[in-house]
Amino acid sequence: STEPIPVHISEETRRKHEESCRLYPWLNLSEHEYVIQMIPRHSIGIWGPTFAMILAIILVSVFMFCYPDIAKPIGLAQSMYPQVILICLMVIILFGIGLYIAIWVYMQNRFFLTNESVIQEIQISLFSKREQTVSLMNIEDSSYSQKGILQTLFNYGSIRLSTEGDETTYRFSYVADPKNQVAVLNNAVEAFKNGRPVTNDD
């Protein structure tokens, strides 16, 4: 049988690969693959749930501290105040944990551009996650869209990738500065298909 010919890996490529493995140890990178850019979601996507949860915590806190004043006019027992404090504190803690989980899940949705592929991590819930990997060679088209005043004002939008062959479409929403991200991606795809090194400077 014929042994596969080992591919020569330059010192620079090896260094970049090792650095990427150190920064993103959960990614399954080949021995000559490294991360060029990590694209997180724009924080605006979590502003609404965060505001709602903070408002709920404030309302529960106000009720807890004002219970004696509220209870007297409507005939509720003042002796219940210790139990009310305990229940309100438990509700506040639950709201806080829920907010933390929501932010964590949202921010775990990430988009990686390497010198060989695009990797999209999709965190659906606390215990549900999937990953999509597309070779740069298979990317036929990449584009971005910004719709509405908010997306234009805060400079975020969506990235869309379409692939050759199976014609699958990949989308990543709430991307900060999508125009620049797509420019970097298009340069990387062009360099890869033309056999040129894919670097951060492309």
Name each model feature, range by range.
Residues 1-202:
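N-terminal basic, Ser/Thr-rich segments that initiate or prime the first beta/alpha elements at protein or domain
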